[in-house]
């Protein structure tokens, strides 16, 4: 049913019906507005989004752009952490009466183009390099909140991040308490930067505090090509054994869970033969067996914090850029062997 047909059935003008749809109720009685709403609901009327934007003079869209490091577009949204983050953002955006426009970008130029062409009230941009964030701020006037972007100390940008250093430091301290002294750090970058570099730094800090020196030989890089990673995990295991490593600390749950699955298929026992840890506490870490020992981050809180920061900018209540760092905690699964007692940890308690 059209607006004209609804108006004729109620004996009101099309302008009156349109005013109810677009929320312009200043010159209308509550009774008339309620009558029109009831008729709209009765016929399941869905207003045209473009018309609503024109009527209000702005959009109701929050743009979400993801460009997490070293992620191919076809892979980025399959990463459980990324998909969980996007789902949490969409839920928070919808709960506040807005709509989500999503794009998985591959290049800085693409991000710049999208930011200029989207009719969005603001942008939440995830996983950019710091130089890309700076460039983006120069080419768009839209309010922007960054998520997991790593700026130099003293730089002032709206960013919601995680205590990545602290999280990996906690994990390394946990492993040290269980008697592990020789550890292999596993990532997917030949030269670590961004979040991966922060996590490695936390690992190094914990080792140094325990009087142990980290060596570059104790870093193993796996391929981003999924077809090659089976061979990589086999080489990783052989390399860890040559170095005498008792545990592999993975940069993310995604790779840790994939490695456990591969190793179990090869008859390698986790944690009896080698211990494995992850980072993120995504859904895969909770369903894999043995359950993964990992670092938890609250993705829902991160999404809500980013959105609230954006709304503070829109409402002009944010006087200056804010950089927020969210805490982490250890999730103790059963993928790590307790070397002190030569037994396996079988607890799901959190530290």
Model-derived segments and their meaning:
Residues 1-60, 343, 348-351:
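N-terminal helix-turn-helix DNA-binding module of bacterial transcription factors
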Residues 90-104, 200, 204-228:
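Short beta-strand elements in bilobed, periplasmic/extracellular small-molecule ligand-binding domains
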Residues 117-126, 184-187, 219, 241-253, ...:
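Periplasmic-binding protein-like
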Residues 160-185, 201, 228-237, 297-315:
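Hydrophobic alpha-helical segments within soluble ligand-binding/sensing domains
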Residues 233-351:
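Flexible loop/turn connectors
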């Amino acid at each position: 049913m059209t607006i004209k047909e609804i108006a004729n059935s109620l004996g009101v003008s099309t302008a009156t019906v349109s005013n109810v749809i677009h929320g312009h109720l200043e010159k209308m009685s509550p009774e008339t507005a309620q009558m029109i709403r009831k008729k709209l609901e009765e016929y399941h009327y869905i207003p045209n989004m473009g018309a609503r934007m024109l009527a209000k003079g702005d959009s109701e869209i929050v743009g979400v752009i993801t460009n997490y490091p070293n992620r191919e577009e076809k892979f980025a949204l399959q990463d459980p952490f990324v998909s969980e983050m996007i789902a949490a953002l969409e839920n928070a955006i919808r709960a506040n009466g807005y709509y989500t426009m999503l794009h998985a970008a591959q290049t800085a130029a693409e991000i710049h183009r999208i930011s200029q062409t989207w009719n969005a009230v603001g942008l939440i941009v995830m996983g950019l390099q710091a130089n890309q964030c700076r460039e983006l701020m120069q080419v768009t006037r839209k309010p922007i909140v960054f998520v997991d972007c790593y700026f130099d100390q003293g730089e002032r940008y709206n960013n919601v991040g995680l205590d990545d250093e602290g999280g990996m430091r906690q994990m390394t301290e946990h492993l040290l308490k269980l008697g592990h002294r020789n550890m292999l750090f596993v990532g997917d970058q030949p030269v670590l930067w961004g979040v991966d570099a922060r996590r490695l730094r936390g690992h190094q800090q914990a080792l140094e505090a325990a009087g142990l020196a980290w060596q570059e030989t104790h870093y193993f890089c796996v391929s981003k090509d999924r077809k090659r990673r089976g061979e990589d995990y086999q080489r990783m295991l052989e390399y860890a054994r040559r170095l005498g490593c008792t545990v592999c600390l993975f940069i993310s749950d995604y790779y840790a869970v994939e490695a456990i699955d591969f190793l179990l298929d090869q008859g390698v026992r986790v944690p009896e033969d080698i211990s494995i840890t992850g980072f993120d506490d995504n859904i895969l870490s909770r369903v894999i067996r043995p359950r993964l020992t990992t670092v938890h981050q609250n993705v829902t809180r991160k999404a809500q914090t980013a959105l609230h920061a954006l709304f503070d900018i829109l409402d002009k209540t944010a006087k200056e850029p804010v950089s927020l760092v969210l805490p982490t905690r250890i999730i103790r699964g059963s993928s790590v062997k307790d070397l002190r007692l030569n037994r396996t940890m079988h607890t799901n308690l959190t530290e």
